[in-house]
A protein has these predicted regions:
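Beta-lactam-recognizing serine transpeptidase/beta-lactamase-like catalytic domain environment
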Residues: 70, 76, 335-348, 360, ...
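Flexible helix-coil linker/hinge segments at domain or subdomain boundaries
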Residues: 705-714
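Conserved, well-ordered alpha-helix/loop/beta-strand core segments that scaffold catalytic motifs
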Residues: 245, 341-390
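Solvent-exposed, polar/charged alpha-helical surfaces in well-ordered, non-transmembrane soluble domains
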Residues: 92-100, 254, 258, 262, ...
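Amphipathic oligomerization regions
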Residues: 684-706
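Membrane-proximal periplasmic segments of bacterial cell-envelope enzymes
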Residues: 1-322, 328-349, 382, 390-391
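Conserved helix-loop functional segments at active or binding sites
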Residues: 374-381, 408, 629, 705
Length: 720
C-alpha cells in the first residue's frame, strides 16, 4: 500500500534534520579535535588553580661602616603538597616513596615527631626546642585520646598553666573545657616523663596516630613511622591554618633536584628559597638567631605570619623583626588532572626586608672578643677550670651607640641549631649574653659614682680629707665591729680624688654613711645603674642595694660590696654618662634602617638623652683626675697602661662571689681630655679586677688604631 504524501513529507523532514544535526556534530568535532585541539586539550587538563605564598628574603644586617654581617643565600628545598597528587593517588604511598628516596640519596628530611621506634618505643620530647615542643603539644591537644589524658593531668597540676596576660582572667581548671585548658598550658614544660605520668605511652600514641592518619595494617611499623613523621608535619600546618606546602628537606643539591623534576614522585616539588648566611663568626649574641614560631598566636596571624614562617628569635634578629621581615609575594599555580604544574605566575611580587645598619664596629668587635677569649683561656689553663665566663661592653660617649658587646664563650650562628643540646648543657653557658643579661656585683668600680653622689649631694667637698686608719666603723660602734679597708695599715688622709686613685674603702664607707642608701641609689639610677639601658635586645636591669635584716647597707653599697648587681652594659653606660657631664643616653644598637637598595633611610637609632644629671665641672674634674691617677704615676694599673696609645682613666673592682672566689670588674674611658669611648669588663672567678687591665688596653688601642672606614665609604656601598 502506498504511503500518503503527508507521511512521506514528514519522513523527509526528519531525515533532513538528523543529517543537519550530524553535520553540525561533525563540524564541532573537527573544530575541537583538529582546528583547536591544543587549546581545548589545555583547557581540559587545567583543572585546578590555586594561590601559593612566596617567602620574601629577610633584610641584610651590616655594621656601622657597611660591612655585611648577615645576608641570605639561595637554596633549593624539597616540598610535599598533597594537593598535587593525582586523583586516587594514595597519600601514604606517595609519602613513603618520597622519604625512601631521601633516605637512599642521603638527604636528611624534616621529622620532628618525638617518637622513636629504635629499640623499645620511646619519646624524645626532651631533645626538642621550645618551638618544637609547642607544635607537638598543639597536635596532642587536637588528638582526642591524648587531649583527654593531658587535661586530667593538668587539672591535677595547675602549676603547668601559663600566668594570665595583663587584663586576662585566670582560667579555672575545674570548669574550663579540655581544649581551653591545654591552650593555656605551658608547652615548654612538656617532657618525656610528663607524658608517661599522664598515661600517654609511646606505644599508645603510635597506635592512636596510625588510627588518626588511617594507616592500614599493610604498612610495617617502621614504614608507618616514616609516614607518620610527614603526616604529623602536614597536620601541624593544617592546625595552623597554613595551606603552604610542607618543606620536607632543605638545601638539597642539583642532582637530587633532577630526580624530583622528572615527575615520578607525586606531590613533590622543588622550590627556591633562602637561608641566613653569616659573613662573620663574631657578634653571635648581638645578631641573634632566627627560627620557627614557637607560640603561633592570633596576633601573629593578624600580622600576616604563617605557622611555617621564619622569625627572629633573639638578638637584633628579634629586636628589628619588623624591619628585617620582608613582604611575602603571591603566586598563582595551575595544576592539571595528573597533578602536574602547567603554569604559574606572580600576582604579587615579594619584597625583601630592609637593611639594618648597627652601631657596632665589626673590627672592634673582633678585637674585643679575641682578647676576652685569650684572657679566659689563660686563666682556665692556670686554674684548670672550664666554666669561667667574661663579658665586655664598649659605648660611644655622647651618643650611647654600642660599638662592641661581647660575651665569652660564644657560639657559631651557622651551626647553633645542630649544636643546641650541647650548647644548652655547657656549664660555661655560651648561649647566655653575659654583657646584657648577667648582673654582677660591681665592687670598687662603683666608687666614681659614689664620689659624684657625695660631691653633688653636698656631704663632702673636693678639698675635704678623711683620715683612713685602715678601717671604718659606725661612730657608736665598738672597735671590734669595724670593717677593714683593703690596706690594713690605712691610707692616711684622703680627699675624693686620692680616694679614687688609691681605692680607699674607708673613705667611701664614710660617704655612704653620710648619704644613706636612698640618696646613693638615686644617684646610681640617674647614672643608669639598675635601670633599663635602652638597648633594643633583651636585658636584665640588675638591682640596687636594699637594706637587709634591719641593717643599713649604705656604707657597703658605696664601694659595691652590698647586694646590688649591674650588667657590664650598665657599667659602661654609667661611665659614659659620668664623663659626659651627666647626660645619660640610651645604649642602643640601631644606627639606621635603609631600604633594600640603600636608597632611602627608613628609621634611625634613638640618640636623645634619657635624663641628665647636672654634674658640676669641679666634681667631674675631681672624679676624672682620680681615675687618671689609677692609670698613671704609680697607680694600680699604671704598668699595663704605659702601652695605651692615649691617656685614659680607669677603675678596677673585685667582688666576692662565695668562699675565696671573686669576679674581676674593670671600667675605663678614653681619651682623658675629650672622652670618646667608655669600656666595662667582667671576668668571672678572677683574682682581682686588675687582671683585666691589659685586656682594657688592648680594647682601647684597637679602637684608636682601627681604620675609620665610615669616613671614606662611598654612599650605598658595602665594604668587605
Amino acid at each position: 500500500m502506498n504511503q500518503r504524501p503527508s507521511q512521506l513529507t514528514r519522513f523527509r523532514v526528519m531525515a533532513a534534520m538528523a543529517l543537519a544535526v550530524l553535520a553540525i556534530y561533525l563540524v564541532v568535532l573537527f573544530n575541537t579535535q583538529v582546528v583547536h585541539h591544543e587549546e581545548y586539550l589545555a583547557k581540559s587538563i587545567q583543572t585546578i588553580t590555586r594561590m601559593e605564598n612566596v617567602e620574601a628574603s629577610r633584610g641584610i644586617i651590616t655594621d656601622r661602616s657597611g660591612r655585611t654581617l648577615v645576608t641570605n643565600q639561595s637554596t633549593y628545598s624539597l616540598t610535599f603538597d598533597a594537593s598535587l597528587l593525582k586523583p586516587g593517588e594514595n597519600q601514604n604511598d606517595a609519602i613513603l616513596r618520597l622519604v625512601t628516596l631521601c633516605r637512599d640519596q642521603g638527604v636528611a628530611w624534616e621529622d620532628n615527631l618525638p617518637l622513636s621506634l629504635d629499640g623499645a618505643a620511646h619519646f624524645t620530647v626532651d631533645t626538642l626546642t621550645d618551638t618544637q615542643k609547642s607544635r607537638f603539644f598543639s597536635y596532642l591537644r587536637d588528638l582526642k585520646p591524648t587531649r583527654e589524658l593531658l587535661a586530667v593531668y593538668v587539672r591535677q597540676h595547675p602549676e603547668l598553666l601559663k600566668a594570665p596576660r595583663e587584663g586576662e582572667t585566670a582560667l579555672d581548671p575545674a570548669t574550663a573545657k579540655d581544649t581551653e585548658l591545654l591552650k593555656q598550658t605551658n608547652s615548654a614544660a612538656l617532657t618525656n616523663s610528663l607524658l608517661l605520668n599522664a598515661g600517654v605511652t609511646p606505644a599508645k600514641l603510635f597506635d592512636w596516630m596510625r588510627e588518626d592518619m588511617k594507616l592500614s595494617d599493610n604498612y610495617s611499623d617502621s614504614d608507618a613511622r616514616l609516614i607518620l613523621g610527614v603526616r604529623y608535619e602536614l597536620k601541624l600546618r593544617k592546625l595552623g591554618a597554613n595551606n603552604n606546602a610542607y618543606v620536607l628537606a632543605q638545601n638539597v643539591d642539583v642532582a637530587f633536584c633532577s630526580l624530583i623534576s622528572d615527575g615520578q614522585f607525586q606531590g613533590a616539588k622543588i622550590i627556591r628559597s633562602s637561608a641566613r648566611q653569616y659573613a662573620t663568626t663574631y657578634a653571635a649574641h648581638i645578631l641573634g638567631t632566627v627560627g620557627g614560631i614557637s607560640d603561633y598566636t592570633d596576633d601573629l596571624k593578624e600580622r600576616g605570619y604563617r605557622m611555617d614562617d621564619t622569625i627572629g628569635l633573639s638578638g637584633v634578629e628579634a629586636a628589628f623583626e619588623d624591619y628585617l621581615r620582608g613582604t611575602d609575594g603571591k603566586r598563582m599555580i595551575s595544576v592539571n588532572s595528573d597533578g602536574k604544574i602547567t603554569g604559574e605566575y606572580y600576582s604579587v611580587e615579594p619584597r625583601s626586608g630592609y637593611t639594618v645598619e648597627l652601631t657596632v664596629d665589626l673590627k672592634l668587635q673582633q678585637a674585643v672578643e679575641d682578647t676576652l677569649a685569650v684572657k679566659v683561656a689563660q686563666l682556665n689553663q692556670k686554674d684548670h677550670l672550664d666554666s669561667r665566663g667574661a663579658a665586655a661592653a664598649v659605648i660611644k660617649v655622647g651618643t650611647g651607640e654600642i660599638l662592641a658587646l661581647a660575651s665569652c664563650p660564644s657560639y657559631d650562628l651557622s651551626t647553633w641549631r645542630k649544636d643546641f643540646a650541647e650548647l644548652r648543657d655547657d656549664p660555661a653557658k655560651p648561649l647566655t649574653n653575659r654583657a646584657t643579661n648577667s648582673p654582677y656585683a660591681p665592687g670598687s668600680t662603683l666608687k666614681p659614682a659614689t664620689a659624684v653622689a657625695a660631691l653633688e649631694s653636698g656631704v663632702t667637698t673636693t678639698t675635704e680629707t678623711i683620715f683612713d686608719p685602715g678601717y671604718w666603723k659606725y661612730p657608736s660602734a665598738t672597735w671590734e665591729n669595724k670593717t677593714n679597708c683593703w690596706k690594713r695599715s690605712g691610707h692616711g688622709k684622703m680627699n675624693v680624688t686620692s680616694a679614687i686613685t688609691n681605692s680607699c674603702n674607708t673613705y667611701f664607707m664614710e660617704m655612704g654613711y653620710r648619704m644613706g642608701l636612698d640618696t646613693l641609689n638615686e644617684y646610681y639610677s640617674a647614672l643608669g645603674l639598675g635601670e633599663p639601658t635602652g638597648i633594643e635586645v633583651g636585658e636584665s636591669t640588675g638591682r640596687q642595694a636594699v637594706n637587709e635584716s634591719g641593717q643599713d647597707q649604705a656604707p657597703w653599697a658605696a664601694f659595691g660590696q652590698a647586694n646590688q648587681e649591674y650588667t657590664p652594659l650598665q657599667l659602661a653606660n654609667y661611665i659614659a654618662t659620668l664623663v659626659s657631664g651627666g647626660k645619660h643616653y640610651p645604649a642602643h644598637l640601631l644606627k639606621t634602617v635603609k631600604s633594600y637598595d640603600n636608597s632611602e633611610i627608613i628609621a634611625t637609632g634613638d640618640t636623645e638623652p634619657l635624663n641628665t644629671l647636672n654634674i658640676s665641672d669641679s666634681t667631674l674634674q675631681a672624679v676624672k683626675k682620680g681615675m687618671l691617677g689609677y692609670t698613671t704615676n704609680g697607680g694600680s694599673v699604671a704598668g699595663p697602661f704605659q702601652n695605651c696609645v692615649v691617656s685614659a682613666g680607669a677603675k678596677t673592682g673585685t667582688a666576692q662571689i662565695g668562699g675565696s672566689m671573686k669576679n674581676g670588674v674593670f671600667v675605663a674611658f678614653a681619651p682623658y681630655d675629650e672622652p670618646e669611648i667608655a669600656v666595662a669588663l667582667v671576668l668571672e672567678k678572677a683574682d682581682a679586677g686588675a687582671v683585666l687591665a691589659t685586656t682594657a688596653v688592648d680594647i682601647i688601642n684597637a679602637y684608636f688604631d682601627r681604620e675609620d672606614t665610615a669616613s671614606i665609604l662611598p654612599e650605598n656601598q658595602l665594604i668587605p
